[in-house]
Amino acid sequence: MEVIQSFTIDHTRLKPGIYVSREDKGFTTYDLRITEPNKEPAVAPAAMHSLEHLMATWFRNSEAKDDVVYVGPMGCLTGMYVIMTGNYTVEDMRRLTIDCLRWILEQDEVPATRPEACGNYLLHDLPMCKWESARYLDRLQHDFHSEYAKLQIVLDDGKVFADA
């Protein structure tokens, strides 16, 4: 089997920021990395779930709403993926994400936290979501990272896979 592209990122050197994870078939997947993998705690599931609801709501109502395909959490709980059509640079996504995080910090409730609207409506934590949002906002404004550190992987057959 081929190595999945996201597994070629050196997670021991990955910093919070915004990265282009992949570009294919007219879609761009952005990696909104909130915490430093394997060095900081992952975002708590309830806070991440609230962040998902809030970010999805904001992005789908933003100036970029017609280009938003998907907003959702990474399985490792260290960030969010945003999939877009259109031509957005990392700086465009940084600006949009900063605006989104500022909006989240002003919210008093998480949208769609009813049993008919959410599959796990009790798993939410707005205060912790806002704490994570404030920390990520500060990082995007003062310590921004957008270039992946690549990892070389030797496959079972001895070939070297490096996604450059």
Regions found by a protein language model. Name each.
Residues M1-N38, I153-V154, V160-A164:
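Non-catalytic terminal extensions that flank enzyme cores
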Residues T12-P16, A56-K65:
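Conserved alpha/beta core surface patches that mediate binding of polyanionic ligands
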Residues F27-R60, Y70-V71:
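Active/ligand-binding-proximal structured segments within catalytic/core domains
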Residues A42-S50, V68, Y81-Y88, D92:
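Short coil/turn segments at secondary-structure boundaries
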Residues H53-N61, R95-R102:
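A broad, structural surface signal
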Residues W58, P115-C118, H142, L155, ...:
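A domain-level signal for the structural core that forms small-molecule/cofactor-binding pockets
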Residues P73-H145:
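Active-site-adjacent, His/Asp/Glu-enriched structural segments that form or flank metal-binding
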